[in-house]
From Swiss-Prot:
InterPro entries given in the database record: FAKV_Clamp
Superkingdom assignment: Viruses
Region (Disordered): 303-331
Protein's gene: S7
Pfam families per the UniProt record, alphabetical: FAKV_Clamp
Species, as recorded: Aedes pseudoscutellaris reovirus (isolate France)
Ranges of biased composition (kind: Low complexity): 312-325
The protein's name in its UniProt record: Uncharacterized protein VP7
Amino acid sequence: MAFTYWDKEKRMTLKQMIQQVTINEQENELTHYVFTTPMSMPTFGKPMLGYVPLNEVATSKFFSNVNDFDRDNQLAMAHFQDTTITRAYNLTNSIKPGDTSLPDAEVAALKWFWKFFTSINLVRQPPMDNVLYWACQFLSSGTSFLPLEKDVEIVFSGFQGSHTCMFASLRQMNLSPILCPYYEHMTNFKTTAEIREYVDANEELKSLITYLCLCTIVGLCDTFVETRNMETGEYVWKVSNVVSDNHTPAQNIGKFCYTTQNAKYMIQLVHVLLFPLTDNKYADLPNYVAVITQGAINQSLPRNVVNNNEGSNSDTTTDTAPSTSGIVSGSADTVASLYPDEFKYVQS
């Protein structure tokens, strides 16, 4: 693909691509990390205002085959060219699982659009040698996937104090011109060790991969909502649009575990991409992300009990914790026994 609109002399540097600003002006001395993208970066299409939940993608027959990436990618790129991602995303609003009326190329584009995520969600344990390779191909073959347009504030509690990460003005960006110089080299590597060595030697490429991880984190965090108890100042996590007061505790636990199951693979991805790298600035990100899962799991502790005796589904709290109506019930041990792997990357 040709990118004639990009001036190579103005390619983004590490400092321009990800600007870290530390602010300690809060009364509780929270540390804010503000990641911004320069407004001069080329954009196209409409900003993405959301994303299709992974559980919906995973149940769609359209995305059940994870072995035909190359064919789908070629069809999609030939059909949509520069706007593959935009067109594929728009199609998800009108397509229904099992629909056979779409042209093969459009179906292929949809499958290609979600390939990076479904390869994690459906294969369950993808070869780690391939994860970084597909991440780079996903970025370099069209655009990055930024799930949210508006500013998002995410609070991580319980890991070395409290940290606030703000992802400012995220938009759909075309990062291909920046990644293209690296792409040929990346596709020739056979092992994760080779890729890591190459990435470690290229600060700009490292920043872009980091950016992908940050975007992935934002997509994951959209599943959760944090609220603050104004009396104690404590931040608590709620699982958003996952659980319901109308469901039984068992149903809620099942939905919660599915959400954290998805979270685990996102955390694995961040570990693979960032943890081995030498840049200490980003080395702790996996731990911060792990707190998301831990925070959600904390919501299942006994203090947020749903009393199901005699068919009742009313909430019962045993202390002065903030209202958690609709939060998953049951003990942490119950959740862990159902899905023990969820705790694999959670730091105590």
